[in-house]
Amino acid sequence: MDVERLQEALKDFEKRGKKEVCPVLDQFLCHVAKTGETMIQWSQFKGYFIFKLEKVMDDFRTSAPEPRGPPNPNVEYIPFDEMKERILKIVTGFNGIPFTIQRLCELLTDPRRNYTGTDKFLRGVEKNVMVVSCVYPSSEKNNSSSLNRMNGVMFPGNSPSYTERSNINGPGTPRPLNRPKVSLSAPMTTNGLPESTDSKEANLQQNEEKSHSDSSTSESEVSSVSPLKNKHPDEDAVEAEGHEVKRLRFDKEGEVRETASQTTSSEISSAVVGETETSSSSQDKDKDSRCTRQHCTEEDEEEDEEEEEESFMTSREMIPERKNQEKESDDALTVNEETSEENNQMEESDVSQAEKDLLHSEGSENEGPVSNDSSDCHETEELVGSNSSKTGEILSESSMENDDEATEVTDEPMEQD
């Protein structure tokens, strides 16, 4: 639509004393209702917009009948004149183009399209008028007519950047910054296909090798590079050495952790095996100890039984021997007493010879229990010695008789055995 022609029509409308409808301006309102593009400023077509709005409301009231029934109790009833004045007052107070201009132009150009009653039409107009945000005309800056607007929603066309027309929240609101788009898609090769993962891995490995080789270069190589690229070669070399030291530390720590894990696992397995072996060996030892204890107890019992039997046998053997010794000692005492009384005149030499004969005969007869016999013999010797000292001299005849009696006494225990 020609903007110059539109401006001339608006000037003619203002110059006329009697306000009438202009087909050129009606065509402009239809264009705004279809596209949402306001090619001129609000101050230029504000007068005709208010005139058209008032005329449409009056025509709608004359053409539409009054409601026959009572008004809806849930809705506040407002008279037509009061609602009309309220709407016109709001539109007159606008300083810019309301962002609902497209919908308002639709209501002005075709009021009966969606409404049949006057009160509903007025409420629809009031809802679209009671707004705050404003928009600028599309041709005001950059003369860009590529932005399309449908029902308050902006549809950018071929222009890559936003303009003043796209700021639907008014002139004072901040606008988004123009930032370059970052493509998140995979890089495309020359044939149009995305790169494969193998090629990516190969590139990564090459980059790592390059970085490693660069870091491992000596200070002399770094200093040989042009001074424009590397202003501080010493610092770069120190940083490279620090990176290498860190890598070596990480590698050593990883190896130490792996070896520690392996050693711990081996220790655990060996400990488990050792426990099983110790348990089995302890069981075997317990069995062996039990067997040895049983054998030892059996042997001890057998030895105890044998000792008891031996002691019993020896006690049996010792009892008659002791009895015989006691009898012999008693007989000897009685014989010695008798001989001492009868033969007081026996000589000491004869007595000693008789005692020797007695001892020799007793030793040949009793060889087993030597200790007891010897003790008894010593007692008899002492008694005989005491008796011999008391008696004095003994005759040779009495000594011969004593020899015969002694032989008889020694024969008696042999007969008992």
Curated annotation (Swiss-Prot):
The keyword Nucleus applies. The modification Phosphoserine is found at S159, S226. Residues 298-311, 338-350, 400-417 have a biased composition (Acidic residues). One of its GO terms (cellular component) is protein phosphatase 4 complex. It is found in: Cytoplasm, Cytoskeleton, Microtubule organizing center, Centrosome; Nucleus. Residues 140-149, 158-170, 186-196, 259-269, 385-399 have a biased composition (Polar residues). It holds the Pfam family PPP4R2. Residues 197-213, 231-258, 283-297, 318-327, 353-363 have a biased composition (Basic and acidic residues). One of its GO terms (biological process) is mRNA processing. Disulfide bonds: none annotated. Serine/threonine-protein phosphatase 4 (PP4) occurs in different assemblies of the catalytic and one or more regulatory subunits. Component of the PP4 complexes PPP4C-PPP4R2, PPP4C-PPP4R2-PPP4R3A and PPP4C-PPP4R2-PPP4R3B. The PPP4C-PPP4R2 complex appears to be a tetramer composed of 2 molecules of PPP4C and 2 molecules of PPP4R2. Interacts with DDX20/GEMIN3 and GEMIN4. Interacts with RPA2; this DNA damage-dependent interaction recruits PPP4C leading to RPA2 dephosphorylation. Regulatory subunit of serine/threonine-protein phosphatase 4 (PP4). May regulate the activity of PPP4C at centrosomal microtubule organizing centers. Its interaction with the SMN complex leads to enhance the temporal localization of snRNPs, suggesting a role of PPP4C in maturation of spliceosomal snRNPs. The PPP4C-PPP4R2-PPP4R3A PP4 complex specifically dephosphorylates H2AX phosphorylated on 'Ser-140' (gamma-H2AX) generated during DNA replication and required for DNA double strand break repair. Mediates RPA2 dephosphorylation by recruiting PPP4C to RPA2 in a DNA damage-dependent manner. This is Serine/threonine-protein phosphatase 4 regulatory subunit 2. The gene is PPP4R2.
